[in-house]
Curated annotation (Swiss-Prot):
Residue numbers binding ATP: I671, G672, R673, G674, Q675, Y676, G677, V678, V679, K694
Family named by the database record: Belongs to the protein kinase superfamily. Ser/Thr protein kinase family.
UniProt function note: May act as a positive regulator of ERK phosphorylation downstream of fibroblast growth factor-receptor activation. May induce both caspase-dependent apoptosis and caspase-independent cell death. May play a role in the embryonic development.
EC number, UniProt record: 2.7.12.1
SUPFAM superfamilies in the record: Protein kinase-like (PK-like)
Cited CDD domains: PKc_Dusty
Keyword entries, A-Z: ATP-binding, Cell junction, Cell membrane, Cytoplasm, Developmental protein, Kinase, Membrane, Nucleotide-binding, Serine/threonine-protein kinase, Transferase, Tyrosine-protein kinase
Region of interest called Disordered, as start-end residue ranges on this chain: 932-953
SMART domains (alphabetical): S_TKc
Protein name in the entry: Dual serine/threonine and tyrosine protein kinase
The keyword Nucleotide-binding appears for this protein: yes
Highest taxon of the lineage: Eukaryota
Native source species: Strongylocentrotus purpuratus (Purple sea urchin)
UniProt subcellular location: Cytoplasm; Cell membrane; Apical cell membrane; Basolateral cell membrane
Length: 953
């Protein structure tokens, strides 16, 4: 009997140990992902490719960062709370299948027990430690604390004596026990919370026992009811645990001891087949044995299921208090909840499989949270790279056009203003004349009321010296000139207001955008541009702020009055004298000469401003040229270095998450083989039945990067009826043994065949055209996302069971901004501009035209023009020279042939948009259906056409 129990103990220990060991292996992969991610992000932050506010977002959120730190740094631990000391001791003894905790009777529950920390050690040993990890050395030599030879942990080492119960240090001390046990050897730790310790609350015990570990919470009970104190403790525990689930373990003895004894014998017999050599067998064998044992456990549970009135109190109490769902719902939910919805549950102590399952799911919960957080960070970085690449490409394309636009608009403004000054001189003279006539009386009145400054004038208005008379005259002149200047210039501004509004607004916005791009460098060029605009074109501001334009008018008008001879010294400088001086000045104005002078000065100033503007714009263009070269270098580095590295990390993080959630897919028969991988069938994975698994073994970093980028673009595309959906991915690190590259398994929805096979199987023309319409719709969807497929061909179009087409193999698919001009694709489908390295999404239109040729031809033979080419180079040369597939009669009607020719036009600008292609192809498809119906080929044409219209809508 003892040998049977020992064998059963090892089997259960290995089962839980296997889960913990598996968790450790997955954690090791997670640590590598985090390490590589930190290195990559550190390099990004020091690269000066992104602004500070963008760099600040490349971090994990605080909550996610905390959980990632816990999972990667702390070992997993079972933290056992309980209703009584005996229930906790029973659970620990059940886990280890030996009496580590000695139980005398129920009186043990009234005693004070300190916390116990079980972890791995080469020898069995115990010691007392404080929270700060210092060992208590004040025990007597030879005391039980120093013993290292025991079967069960001595009670005296866990029991707090009465004389020590008022000693806070002794109460808070922890009994640390080391065991050489397979379960603890996997770095699992077990912590048992203190019992009946005065002054130590549940929250304090929780904080101490969960410190520096990754907790899995268990609460055991062995009484028929929970006391009010138990319920308060549970509520406090729930508040401390937050979102962490709690497993309630029923440690009560079975109601039928004899039946329980027979059931234990049956379980022991079932587990006895294990021996020491099979402790870490293959996953398949372990999983098979586990399923067999779970089946046995299920049968046993059915046999010992209690009656409805048999001890339901505790579960009802837990349900009413909200700690668990109702007993019926708890039974239905058990075993079917996914990891994201793991909840509190109740299990029987003897249902070890369910307990192990809860522990496994709790550990998975930690891993999934970490993997999800890391994957979200990787996705954020990838989206940032793509957005940045688009911004950089736009900057490279738009900046030269902005500079050219600014130059063109400035020239137009210069020519318009120059013509204005040449044509408006007579109007300007009339403007000055009318202005003077309108304001003469007002000027005379203001002159008569003027009070001289800095002059000594007697009360009678007498002036004694000729010098003072001259100064009085000058002040009257200044007054009249100032008023005259303001009115003349105000009307002068109105004559060029239309030009100012027509040219300056757009020109200023264009220059402002150029200066904003160069805003970090406050150079003389930027300042000069602003000064030129203010001085040359913003006439209103310059005049009103006493700029040089005002000074020009001021000085010229002063010259006209210099010839006025001073009056004889009057006896009185009164109002009449002031008005007379002002009237004399107005009478001596020469409007023609003044208008000519103003126009001449304005032309001179305009020419100088134009030359200065052109020089400054050339300097700005040179600066932007250097900056754009640096921008192109940054774009290439983002595309070639940072994006592939982060895409690979994103692939690894999501693959690890899928591995934790759904496990390794079981590969069945081979259903396809391509250049880069093999495709297998898979019965079910991740809740999806009938999957296809594409197994790829990247031989080097370049292939790894290409695969990662393909997966990123495929996975980031929203679900669409015309794109083959990717379900998930798993990385098999054990593929090929040590030192070999791991295999990447991409799981996709299972399709029936490809278009190449369908055409060989003599698919009818209307159905082939229907598939071509599906392809056009799928490519249009990719283009709407800014993606270019670059490899549209027959074998990359898969058909479902209804012969509807879906595009697959996005290995060459990229956003336009992320393309480097590399030559990719299938030679016969490659547009001529692909060989130059400068192309856009119209290459997909070209490839679609070639695909349409095969669709209408009804066979998969090479076009005769291409069949004569000896090799790829010969084929590419012919394509660049304009060689295209020939027209087949009578297969091609005029509409289909013209659509093909326009699609594969040599100039990308001459190719139609895919929306236009789809519209014309719809007409061709409708005619094909009508023709088949007219020939008696079937009555389903109208129905198919109606279905297609519905799909299109």
């Amino acid at each position: 009997m003892s040998s049977r129990r020992l064998g059963s103990s090892r089997a259960r220990g290995r089962d839980l140990a296997h889960e913990v060991k598996h968790f450790g292996g997955l954690t090791k992969h997670l640590k590598k992902i985090i390490f590589d991610s930190n290195n990559c992000l550190t390099e990004l932050k020091t690269s000066d490719h992104f602004e500070e506010e963008v760099i600040s977002t490349l971090v994990l959120p605080p909550v996610a960062d905390e959980i990632v730190g816990k999972v990667t740094k702390n070992p997993p631990a079972l933290v056992i709370f309980g209703q009584t000391y005996t229930s906790k001791a029973t659970l620990v003894n059940k886990i280890f299948r030996e009496d580590l905790f000695q139980i005398v009777d129920d009186s043990d529950n009234n005693k004070t027990w300190r916390a116990v920390h079980l972890k791995y050690g080469s020898q069995r040993n115990t010691r007392l430690t404080l929270t700060n990890s210092f060992e208590l050395l004040n025990e007597e030599p030879g005391s039980p604390v120093m013993r290292n030879s025991w079967t069960g942990i001595p009670r005296v080492e866990m029991l707090v004596k009465e004389e020590h119960q008022k000693d806070a240090c002794m109460l808070s001390a922890t009994t640390e026990a080391t065991l050489n046990h397979p379960l603890l050897q996997c770095k699992l730790q077990i912590l048992v919370t203190p019992h009946n310790c005065p002054g130590i609350s549940i929250s304090q015990a929780y904080n101490v026992c969960t410190h520096n570990v990754l907790p899995v919470l268990l609460y055991c009970f062995d009484k028929d009811q929970l006391s009010e104190e138990n319920l308060r403790d549970l509520q406090e525990l729930q508040n401390c645990a937050g979102t962490l689930p709690i497993l309630f373990v029923d440690c009560r003895e079975p109601s039928e001891p004899l039946v329980a004894h027979r059931e234990r014998r049956l379980v022991e017999d079932a587990h006895e087949d294990f021996d020491d050599d099979s402790a870490y067998d293959t996953d398949e064998r372990i999983e098979g044995e586990r399923e067999r044992h779970n089946g046995l456990d299920a049968r046993l549970r059915r046999r010992c299921r209690p009656t409805p009135n048999d001890r339901p109190s505790v579960i009802d109490q837990l349900s009413r208090a909200g700690f668990i769902s109702s007993p019926e719902e708890n039974g239905r939910m058990r075993g079917v909840l996914d990891v994201f919805t793991i909840v509190n549950q109740v299990e029987d102590l003897h249902n070890s499989a369910a307990i192990v399952q809860f522990i496994r799911r709790s550990l998975q919960y930690y891993l999934i949270r970490c993997c999800t957080a890391m994957h979200d960070l990787h996705q954020h970085c990838m989206n940032l790279f793509i957005t940045t690449a688009f911004d950089m490409q736009r900057d490279i394309l738009v900046t030269p056009k902005r500079i050219e636009y600014a130059r063109q608009r400035e020239n137009e403004l210069f020519d318009s203003l120059k013509d204005l000054t040449n044509q408006k001189q007579e109007q300007l003279r009339s403007l000055i004349q009318s202005t003077v006539a309108d304001m003469t009386e007002d000027l005379l009145e203001q002159a008569g009321n003027y009070r001289f400054t800095d002059l000594e004038v007697s009360q009678e208005g007498k002036i004694q010296s000729q010098k003072d008379i001259k100064r009085c005259t000058e002040q009257i002149q200044d007054l009249v000139l100032a008023r005259l200047n303001a009115c003349v210039v105000e009307k002068l501004i109105g004559s060029v207001e239309l030009l100012r509004e027509s040219f300056l607004g757009t020109l200023q916005r264009c220059l402002a955008s150029l200066e904003k791009i160069d805003g970090d460098l406050e150079t003389s060029t930027t300042v000069a541009l602003r000064q030129i605009l203010n001085a040359a074109y913003q006439v209103e501001v310059s005049v009103r702020t006493s700029s040089s334009v005002v000074r020009i008018i001021w000085e010229r008008m002063k010259e006209f009055f210099q010839s006025i001879k001073p009056f004889k010294t009057p006896t009185r400088v009164d109002t009449e004298w002031k008005r007379k001086v002002a009237q004399t000045m107005i009478n001596n104005l020469d409007e023609s000469k003044l208008a000519k002078s103003i126009c001449s000065q304005f032309r001179s100033r305009l020419n100088n401003s134009h030359e200065s503007f052109s020089t400054s714009l050339r300097q700005l263009e040179q600066k932007h040229s250097g900056r754009l070269e640096k921008t192109e270098e940054q774009r290439m580095k983002v595309r070639k270095v940072y994006a592939p590295r982060l895409a690979r990390l994103a692939l690894e993080s999501t693959s690890l998450r899928d591995m934790v959630l759904y496990g390794m897919p079981k590969l069945e028969r081979e259903i396809g083989r391509g250049q880069y991988g093999v495709v297998y069938s898979c019965r079910s994975w991740g809740g999806v039945t009938h999957c296809a698994v594409k197994s790829v073994v990247p031989p080097d970093d370049k292939h790894w990067n290409d695969l990662a980028m393909e997966f990123h673009y495929t996975r980031s595309i929203a679900e669409h009826d015309r794109i083959v959906a990717v379900i998930g991915s798993v990385i098999d690190h054990g593929y090929g043994g040590m030192g070999c590259s791991p295999a990447v398994l991409l799981l996709m929805e299972r399709m029936q065949r490809d278009l190449h096979t369908a055409i060989k199987a003599n698919m009818e023309l209307p159905e082939r055209l229907h598939v071509a319409l599906d392809v056009a719709e799928g490519v249009r969807y990719l283009h709407s996302l800014g993606l270019v497929h670059r490899d549209i061909k027959l074998k990359n179009v898969l058909l479902d069971k209804h012969d509807r087409g879906k595009i697959t193999d996005l290995g060459f698919c990229k956003p336009e901004a992320m393309m480097s001009g590399s030559i990719v694709g299938t030679p016969i489908h490659m547009a001529p501009e692909l060989f130059s390295g400068k192309y856009d999404n119209s290459v997909d239109t070209y490839a679609f035209g070639i695909l349409l040729w095969y669709v209408c031809a009804g066979h998969v033979k090479l076009p005769q023009a291409f069949e004569q080419c000896a090799n790829k180079d010969h084929l590419w040369t012919s394509v660049k020279k304009g060689v295209r597939p020939e027209r087949l009669r009578p297969q091609f009607d005029d509409a289909s042939w013209n659509l093909m020719k326009s699609s594969w036009a040599g100039e990308p600008s001459e190719r139609p948009l895919l929306g236009e292609v789809q519209s014309k192809l719809q007409d061709i498809y409708t005619k094909a259906l009508a023709k088949r119906e007219a020939e008696g080929g079937g009555g389903g044409g109208a129905k198919e056409q109606q279905n297609l219209k519905s799909d299109t809508l």
